[in-house]
């Protein structure tokens, strides 16, 4: 259809032939790649320059031949090129002939022939250049098929009426989705055609005679076939119209027959054997919908499948199941009868849903019980794809075509729809039914897995595909038809069928298929099964809405498909409601479906995965529909309960398939979405995020042109999966001890953002990814811990195990003796040590455990304090050396911060944070160092602590998680860019700010400048204020030694930061934020000055610097995030504040940065650890921030009141006033804190640095 449509358009333009010829070159180029195309173009140009004369002569010859040959001759001439492009061009030329006068047609045909020759030459050149022998072979195979089908399409277009044109478009689509895509690509290079004309002329001269003869014969055959097909389509169209009319009547009848049909719809469980038999019969008979006189030979099942690759195959698959209850199976394909059956099935579904609710409930229960693997389940899904759904799907099946085909068909439909909406809908129904007949058996065989996962009807394929792995296996999924494999990915069918199949439940398969049907015919009969009454209304709706939807679907087809998929997906009420055809209705129905399938969210595929439950984070608009789709499937989710296992096993690997399918399927508007949705259903999380991304892209309007690879690539999905579960694809349910749920959810978002960079979900996904990545980092640690713990728990409580030696059933670890018998840990170790079985007399009732000193003991605290102080000193020294470039280094170092160092630096500040809020500032400051050291050590050891500081910005945001969290995250993203992407992309300042804020979690003064810079939200400012106070304390503690320098630095920093704060506040646009920033600035300045002073003081210790210079380079760089110890934090703060100062204030950069001259930039590898730490850091920060928030709120209330009082119209004034007041307050506090903490800090620093330096240095190195 694409071929036909675009050629038609070009023919209408009069340059269709040339454009097509160019397009041919484009196609070839597209196949070969830009380089290949360029090489081919160069070759073509050379040949063209050499053969312009020849080309002119050849053009005349081709023109004469074409003119003489007539449309078929032209087609043959184009085919003579020997390339699909030639056929396409010829097809275009034929269309041009149809559209234009005989003479223009002849000229166009001649041009087309020339272009075809050129294109063939170009394609050959490209092929030779690209060495795409395989592609050329494929192209040749496609060329013959495409030439035939294209010629047929062209002939059809020439011969057929508008409806015939639609049929022709379908025929063109049938030719080859790749060919269609090729045509789409081919339409774009007149220049290329011209360039390749000489080559084409040569090629034509070489191939034209043979090709012309062959193509003439082929065209004659194709023309006959096309005519037959068109006549069949027309007949089918008329039949379809009659069927639709009859079906409407029948729907009413079906409503009456609902009880009878209900067994078809929902009681298939009881009639599963019959349904399976019918489905099997349908599957065995590719032309189960054989009423269409449509000759399959003319359009291979692949063509048919291609024609309606996504919806039809799914529909067919469902039809296979439906054939069970459609009576003639594929009755839909049968046309009126099938429609009647569909209506009956829909009525039955509706009756079941309404009057026969017990049946539905029973079916649902059975489905849930049978875990969607039994026939009943497939039957359920059969119901989902009830006949009416099938009808709807058929109507939408044109949309089910590959995205391009779908798009083109949609455009074609739009053109023809306006003229022949109903007719073409019917015609498409017929064609789709026909194709569904073949596809029915194809998909049926394959789709059996999809539609009849449980259903024996498709059981031959499904039985083999019974396992998720098989179902998801690319071969089986794409096995729908080998011809369709590549296309299959493009076809939603593959994704939905296979995804559905993957759900092992034909239930899910049918649900997904039904959803996709619904998705593809969002308005049509998605709910038909479940809503017979809705079906009747919606058939009218369908016809009405199908017309609208064919228009809308062209616009919103993908989106609606998504919505419809979501609702269709639901076996019951979701599908019913979803039947409403309007896109809005689809959305509402999706919501209603979610509501109706109350278990949709609750079922959550039984995975508890946010993805499953509502297609986790599917995003709004169509994406929610997606989610609903999954969750209508969710309705089946319980049925999928076993699928949980499958998901665990196949979810991840299936995700890539799903992604691939989705990506290719996405190309097919709803198909891709449906595939994603189905995949989502199958994968629960990943597919959903990917599908959501696809849906979001679709919602963005890219759906029409959703590039499968654009949103979901196998690598992207794998990356997302890896990010989600720490790369453990087979354990998607990552063992996130603390943030597993969030990590997973965020990971889902992350996957979404990864999958669909351009999708609507990306923004949310980005933040989700930021937290998700952090969560993942934390999760990976948690996973290991939890896995180890789970192993131990399972080992100690392994049911049925008893020691073969002492017969105990309780042990900390099960071992095996040389005989392989299980023995308890004691016996195993005893034997291992003594080589003698452990005497039973040694058996004890209790398990002897080594007495380990509990973590957090005073000794450890002192050690950690020493280490922290040493690290801080070393870091300060290294920062002194490293801080000069910290502005830049910190950016990279932020990203580069070592995971270990990060936890140290970040966690220490954060841990100190935790203690800070608890204690008064002086006490907090005093204890902060201790806490910094202690907590830092604990934080370093604790992934959460590690994550906490990293996410100190997040923590801030978490502190004010209500709105500030988002604001802060945004702020952090803008200023700090918490999101991994943002962090990576963050400017040095932002990076520094981010790190500073993170280190600020320990030492917030640097963070405060960052906050000041970032301070998008007052919350952030509040946090910064508290952080600044804390930082002031920390810095006072660390920098009291250098209080004078700190004061000087603070002055400089204050001035700069005030300016920065003013600008930041102006940026933040919130005077309160600005004032808060101003307030924060003094603290941050003080902190920065203190950090600078601390860095200067730390610089004194060259050894520490030398040791930590590298570590601190990373640490200081990571310093914002990674201050290892309070001292390290201080030095990090100094470096960070310096770096902030530097990057924020270059003038002060010199003054303050003299303290910190980074010797080397930290490697970027810290970025990932930083992100990894973020989840844990968020937790730590959230806890700390909750405390800090209280302090900050108090400070903010005081400061904010002062600021508010002192606020002036000028942000600068606000900043200055706030900064001045804040600075004064902070200075006073700092002085007090310094007085109180100076001694302690100096002592701690001295003690830590002095006696701990050697040990700590080693420790720091080790920690690093």
From Swiss-Prot:
Deletion consequences:
Reduced levels of phagocytic receptor crq/croquemort in macrophages during embryogenesis stage 13.
Q: Which SUPFAM superfamilies match?
A: Glucocorticoid receptor-like (DNA-binding domain)
The annotated regions of Low complexity compositional bias extend over: 161-171, 422-438, 447-459, 523-554, 565-585, 599-614, 909-950, 985-1007, 1024-1048, 1185-1200
Listed A to Z, the keywords are:
Activator, Developmental protein, DNA-binding, Metal-binding, Nucleus, Phosphoprotein, Transcription, Transcription regulation, Zinc, Zinc-finger
Task: Name where it mostly resides.
Answer: nucleus
Q: Which GO terms describe its biological process?
A: amnioserosa maintenance; cell fate commitment; crystal cell differentiation; dorsal closure; embryonic heart tube development; embryonic hemopoiesis; endoderm development; endoderm formation
SMART domains, alphabetically?
ZnF_GATA (SM00401)
Bias regions of kind Gly residues — which residues? 16-25
Segments carrying the region annotation (Disordered) are 1-25, 161-200, 234-253, 405-463, 523-585, 599-627, 841-867, 899-1048, 1181-1202
Which subcellular locations apply to this protein? Nucleus
**Which residue numbers delimit the GATA-type Zn fingers?**
803-827
* Highest taxon, organism lineage: Eukaryota
What does the domain comment read? The GATA-type Zn-finger domain is required for binding DNA and interacting with Bfc. Isoform 2 differs from isoform 1 in that it has an additional zinc finger domain. It is unknown if both zinc fingers are required for DNA binding or interaction with Bfc.
What role does this protein play? Answer: May function as a transcriptional activator protein and may play a key role in the organogenesis of the fat body. Binds a sequence element (5'-[TA]GATAA-3') found in the larval promoters of all known alcohol dehydrogenase (ADH) genes. Acts as a homeotic gene downstream of the terminal gap gene HKB to promote morphogenesis and differentiation of anterior and posterior midgut.
Its protein name is Box A-binding factor
Gene source species? Drosophila melanogaster (Fruit fly)
Q: Which gene encodes it?
A: srp
């Amino acid at each position: 259809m694409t071929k036909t449509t675009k050629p038609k358009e070009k023919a209408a333009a009069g340059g269709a032939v040339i454009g097509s010829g160019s397009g041919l070159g484009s196609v070839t180029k597209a196949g070969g790649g830009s380089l290949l195309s360029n090489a081919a173009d160069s070759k073509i140009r050379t040949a063209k320059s050499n053969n312009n004369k020849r080309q002119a002569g050849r053009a005349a010859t081709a023109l004469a031949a074409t003119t003489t040959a007539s449309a078929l001759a032209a087609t043959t001439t184009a085919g003579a090129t020997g390339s699909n492009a030639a056929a396409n061009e010829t097809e275009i030329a034929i269309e041009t002939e149809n559209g234009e006068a005989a003479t223009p047609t002849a000229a166009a045909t001649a041009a087309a022939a020339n272009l075809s020759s050129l294109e063939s030459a170009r394609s050959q050149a490209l092929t030779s250049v690209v060495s795409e022998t395989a592609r050329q072979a494929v192209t040749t195979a496609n060329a013959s098929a495409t030439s035939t089908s294209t010629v047929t399409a062209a002939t059809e277009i020439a011969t057929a009426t508008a409806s015939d044109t639609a049929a022709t478009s379908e025929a063109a689509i049938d030719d080859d989705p790749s060919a269609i895509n090729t045509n789409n690509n081919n339409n774009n290079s007149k220049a290329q055609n011209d360039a390749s004309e000489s080559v084409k002329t040569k090629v034509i001269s070489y191939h034209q005679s043979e090709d012309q003869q062959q193509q003439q014969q082929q065209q004659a055959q194709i023309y006959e076939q096309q005519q037959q097909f068109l006549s069949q389509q027309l007949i089918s169209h008329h039949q379809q119209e009659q069927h639709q009319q009859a079906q409407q009547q029948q729907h009413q009848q079906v409503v009456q027959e609902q009880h009878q049909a209900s067994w078809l719809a929902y009681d298939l469980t009881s009639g599963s054997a019959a349904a399976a038999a019918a489905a099997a019969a349908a599957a065995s008979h590719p032309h189960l919908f054989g009423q269409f006189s449509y000759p399959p030979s003319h359009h291979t099942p692949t063509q048919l499948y291609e024609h309606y690759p996504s919806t039809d195959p799914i529909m067919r698959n469902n039809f296979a199941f439906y054939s069970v209850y459609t009576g003639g199976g594929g009755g839909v394909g049968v046309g009126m009868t099938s429609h009647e059956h569909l209506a009956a099935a829909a009525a039955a579904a509706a009756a079941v849903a309404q009057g026969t609710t017990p049946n539905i409930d029973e079916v649902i229960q059975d489905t849930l019980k049978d875990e969607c693997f039994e026939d009943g389940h497939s039957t359920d899904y059969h119901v989902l794809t009830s006949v009416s759904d099938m009808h709807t799907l058929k109507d939408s099946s044109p949309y089910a075509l590959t995205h391009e085909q779908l798009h083109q068909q949609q455009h074609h439909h739009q053109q023809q729809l306006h003229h022949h909406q109903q007719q073409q809908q019917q015609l498409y129904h017929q064609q789709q039914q026909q194709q569904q007949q073949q596809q029915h058996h194809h998909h049926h065989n394959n789709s059996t897995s999809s539609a009849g996962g449980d259903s024996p009807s498709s059981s031959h394929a499904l039985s083999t595909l019974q396992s998720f792995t098989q179902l998801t296996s690319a071969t089986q999924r794409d096995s729908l038809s080998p011809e369709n494999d590549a296309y299959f990915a493009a076809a939603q069918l593959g994704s939905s069928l296979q995804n559905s199949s993957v759900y092992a439940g034909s239930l899910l398969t049918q649900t997904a298929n039904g959803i996709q049907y619904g998705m593809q015919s969002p308005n049509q009969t998605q709910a038909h099964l479940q809503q017979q009454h809705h079906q009747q209304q919606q058939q009218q709706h369908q016809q009405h809405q199908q017309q609208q939807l064919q228009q809308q679907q062209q616009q919103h087809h993908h989106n609606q498909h998504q919505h419809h998929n979501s609702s269709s997906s639901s076996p019951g009420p979701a599908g019913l409601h979803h039947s409403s055809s309007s896109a809005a209705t689809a959305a509402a129905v999706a919501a209603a479906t979610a509501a109706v399938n109350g278990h949709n969210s609750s079922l959550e595929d039984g995975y508890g995965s946010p993805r499953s439950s509502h297609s986790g984070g599917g995003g709004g608009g169509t994406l929610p529909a997606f989610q609903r789709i999954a969750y209508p499937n969710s309705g089946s989710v319980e049925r999928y309960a076993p699928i949980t296992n499958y998901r665990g096993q196949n979810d991840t690997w299936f995700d890539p398939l799903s992604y691939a399918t989705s990506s290719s399927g996405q190309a097919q508007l709803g198909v891709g979405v449906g595939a994603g949705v189905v995949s989502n259903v199958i994968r629960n999380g990943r597919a959903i995020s990917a599908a959501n991304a696809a849906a979001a892209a679709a919602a963005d309007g890219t759906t029409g042109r959703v590039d499968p690879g654009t949103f979901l690539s196998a690598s992207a999905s794998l990356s997302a999966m890896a990010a989600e579960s720490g790369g453990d694809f087979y354990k998607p349910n990552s063992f996130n001890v603390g943030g597993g749920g969030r990590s997973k959810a965020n990971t889902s978002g992350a996957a979404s953002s990864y999958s669909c960079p351009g999708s609507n979900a990306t923004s949310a996904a980005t933040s989700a990814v930021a937290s998700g990545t952090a969560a993942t980092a934390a999760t990976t640690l948690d996973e290991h811990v939890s896995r180890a713990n789970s192993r131990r728990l399972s080992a100690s409580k392994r049911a049925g195990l008893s020691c073969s030696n002492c017969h105990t059933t309780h042990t900390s670890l099960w071992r095996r003796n040389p005989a392989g018998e299980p023995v308890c840990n004691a016996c195993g170790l005893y034997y291992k040590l003594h080589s003698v079985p452990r005497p039973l007399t040694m058996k004890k009732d209790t398990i002897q455990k080594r007495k380990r000193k509990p973590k957090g003991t005073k000794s450890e605290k002192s050690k950690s304090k020493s280490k922290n102080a040493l690290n801080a000193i070393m870091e300060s020294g290294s920062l002194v050396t490293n801080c000069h470039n910290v502005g830049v280094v910190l950016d990279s170092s932020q990203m580069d911060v070592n995971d270990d160092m990060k936890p140290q630096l970040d966690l220490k500040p954060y841990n100190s944070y935790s203690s800070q809020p608890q204690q008064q500032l002086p006490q907090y400051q005093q204890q902060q160092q201790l806490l910094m050291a202690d907590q830092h050590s604990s934080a370093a050891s604790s992934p959460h602590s590690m994550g906490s500081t990293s996410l100190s910005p997040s923590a801030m945001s978490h502190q004010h998680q209500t709105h500030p969290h988002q604001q802060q995250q945004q702020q952090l993203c803008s200023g700090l860019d918490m999101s991994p992407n943002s962090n990576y992309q963050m400017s040095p300042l932002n990076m520094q700010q981010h790190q500073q804020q993170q280190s600020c979690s320990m030492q917030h003064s640097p963070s405060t400048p960052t906050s000041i810079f970032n301070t998008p939200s007052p919350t952030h400012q509040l946090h910064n204020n508290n952080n600044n106070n804390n930082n002031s304390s920390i810095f006072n503690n660390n920098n009291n030694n250098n209080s004078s320098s700190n004061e000087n630095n603070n002055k400089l920093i204050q001035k700069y930061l005030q300016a920065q704060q003013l600008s930041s506040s102006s940026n933040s646009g919130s005077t309160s934020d600005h004032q808060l920033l101003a307030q924060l600035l003094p603290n941050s300045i003080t902190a920065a000055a203190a950090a600078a002073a601390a860095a200067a003081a730390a610089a004194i210790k060259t050894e520490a610097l030398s040791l930590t210079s590298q570590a601190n380079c990373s640490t200081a760089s990571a310093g914002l995030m990674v201050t290892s110890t309070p001292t390290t934090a201080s030095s990090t703060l100094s470096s960070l504040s310096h770096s902030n100062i530097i990057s924020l204030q270059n003038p002060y950069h010199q003054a303050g940065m003299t303290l910190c001259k980074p010797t080397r930039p930290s490697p970027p590898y810290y970025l990932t650890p930083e992100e990894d730490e973020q989840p844990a850091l968020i937790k730590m920060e959230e806890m700390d921030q909750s405390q800090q928030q209280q302090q900050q709120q108090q400070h903010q209330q005081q400061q904010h009141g002062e600021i508010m009082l002192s606020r002036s119209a000028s942000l600068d004034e606000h900043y200055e006033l706030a900064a001045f007041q804040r600075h004064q307050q902070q200075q006073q506090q700092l002085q007090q804190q310094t007085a109180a903490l100076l001694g302690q800090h100096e002592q701690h620093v001295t003690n830590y640095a002095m006696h701990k330096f050697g040990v700590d240095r080693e420790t720091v190195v080790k920690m690093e």
